[in-house]
């Protein structure tokens, strides 16, 4: 029997978010709907989830001592990693001492870098993947590129949102790609993965939910990425029955191996009826933002239910839906948005502004969600709304 206490009392059920971006913000909101006390943690102040949490902390989550000290201070019932850049070896130790890591410390540890999860999928589970090799220095990197062949994709083994990711088209790109990968890694310089191209027809995210009643799948989500970062997603993406069955089989094998309860974003390449494993995130996925309108229960609501041990009787898709990221480019900590009336004049359009405190370079600051009679119309509707939003980047005020 699930028991939830009253927030801010000695019987509170406490959840700690490690990572407090826009995805963590939605998880925090869903947990609070069930009366869970939410503690938001990140490496910077005023992160999106901090703005809706009961309280917040700023620490270096890659520092195992800081991480342990905070967790032992707060004693949360649930530790919920929302990003990769965490001292996951310490999470393994904390789990062994009795803390509950969602979905599991093993899942967080294996997926914090691309090497752990790729070796699990390809070498232990025998799943089809793109050709790959790992490199820890420039010499081994050059050998890996030669072995895989060009064109190939280079990624830091630990990064997100496409940071440090590039494509090598010729020998002249090798040194540039290595430098870029070293600059883009979440934990600084380190290993990279070199991946051969899969000649795929499309790629999808299959949101896979492990919960008290078993394993459930959301409808496939199609998406467009630019520079390795999500820009547009839509649901349901059409797949043949054979390909869908293969995708679900791969997703179930990977998530069973990772263990625990919660939502997993399983990324797959599809060519005809053949399906190749790409990556998995043991948490809500950015392409899954579309589920805020496309399903009766969003990926965030599903994650909350699963980790709390609550039932998920039915995941219902509500029609052709799309999301388009609101990408802002510039340098400012005084960002404003206007012309929202134009963006929201259609009855089937919704907007989420994430409340991120600043932008330096390019940053996803919001998302538009739309539904229509078909996917093309939903994507056009969402894009039109994004295009109508005016972003104002005010000059930073110098502190005396």
Curated annotation (Swiss-Prot):
GO MF terms held by the record: ATP binding; magnesium ion binding; phosphoribosylglycinamide formyltransferase 2 activity; phosphoribosylglycinamide formyltransferase activity
Magnesium is among the record's keywords: yes
Amino-acid positions noted as binding Mg(2+) in the UniProt annotation, renumbered to this chain: 267, 279
Domain ATP-grasp: 119-308
Pathway in which this enzyme or protein is active: Purine metabolism; IMP biosynthesis via de novo pathway; N(2)-formyl-N(1)-(5-phospho-D-ribosyl)glycinamide from N(1)-(5-phospho-D-ribosyl)glycinamide (formate route): step 1/1
GO biological process, one term: 'de novo' IMP biosynthetic process
PROSITE patterns assigned: ATP_GRASP (PS50975)
Alphabetical UniProt keywords: ATP-binding, Ligase, Magnesium, Metal-binding, Nucleotide-binding, Purine biosynthesis
Catalytic reaction annotation: N(1)-(5-phospho-beta-D-ribosyl)glycinamide + formate + ATP = N(2)-formyl-N(1)-(5-phospho-beta-D-ribosyl)glycinamide + ADP + phosphate + H(+)
Entry protein name: Formate-dependent phosphoribosylglycinamide formyltransferase
Taxonomic placement: Bacteria, Pseudomonadati, Pseudomonadota, Gammaproteobacteria, Oceanospirillales
């Amino acid at each position: 029997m699930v028991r939830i206490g009253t927030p801010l009392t000695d019987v509170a059920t406490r959840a700690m978010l490690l990572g407090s971006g826009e995805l963590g913000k939605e998880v925090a909101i869903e947990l609070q709907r069930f009366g869970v006390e939410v503690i938001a943690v990140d490496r910077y102040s005023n992160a999106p989830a901090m703005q809706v949490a009961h309280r917040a902390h700023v620490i270096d989550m890659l520092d195992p001592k800081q991480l342990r000290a905070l967790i032992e201070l707060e004693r949360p019932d649930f530790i919920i990693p929302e990003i990769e850049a965490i001292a996951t070896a310490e999470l393994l130790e904390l789990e062994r001492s009795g803390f509950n890591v969602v979905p599991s410390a093993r899942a967080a540890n294996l997926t914090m870098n691309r090497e752990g999860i790729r070796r699990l999928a390809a070498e232990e589970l025998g799943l089809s993947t793109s050709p790959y090799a790992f490199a820890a220095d420039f010499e081994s990197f050059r050998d890996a590129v030669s072995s895989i062949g060009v064109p190939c994709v280079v990624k830091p083994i630990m990064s997100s949102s496409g940071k440090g990711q590039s494509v090598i088209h010729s020998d002249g790109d090798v040194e540039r790609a290595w430098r870029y990968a070293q600059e883009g890694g979440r934990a600084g310089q380190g290993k990279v993965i070199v991946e051969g191209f899969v000649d795929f027809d499309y790629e999808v995210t299959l949101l896979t939910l492990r919960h008290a009643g078993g394993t459930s799948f959301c409808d496939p989500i199609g998406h467009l990425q630019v520079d390795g970062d999500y820009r547009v997603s839509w649901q349901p993406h059409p797949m043949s029955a054979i390909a869908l069955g293969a995708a679900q089989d791969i997703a179930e094998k990977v998530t069973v191996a990772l263990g625990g309860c919660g939502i997993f974003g399983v990324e797959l390449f599809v060519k005809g009826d053949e399906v190749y494993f790409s990556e998995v995130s043991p948490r809500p996925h950015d392409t899954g933002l579309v589920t805020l309108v496309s399903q009766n229960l969003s990926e965030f609501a599903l994650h909350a239910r699963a980790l709390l041990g609550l039932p998920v009787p039915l995941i219902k898709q509500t029609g052709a839906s799309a999301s388009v990221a609101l990408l802002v480019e510039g340098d400012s900590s005084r960002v404003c948005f206007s012309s929202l009336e134009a963006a929201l004049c259609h009855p089937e359009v919704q907007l989420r502004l994430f409340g991120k405190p600043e932008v330096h370079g390019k940053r996803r600051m919001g998302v538009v969600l739309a539904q229509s009679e078909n996917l093309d119309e939903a994507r056009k509707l969402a894009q039109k709304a994004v295009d109508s939003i005016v972003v104002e980047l005010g000059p930073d005020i110098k502190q005396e």
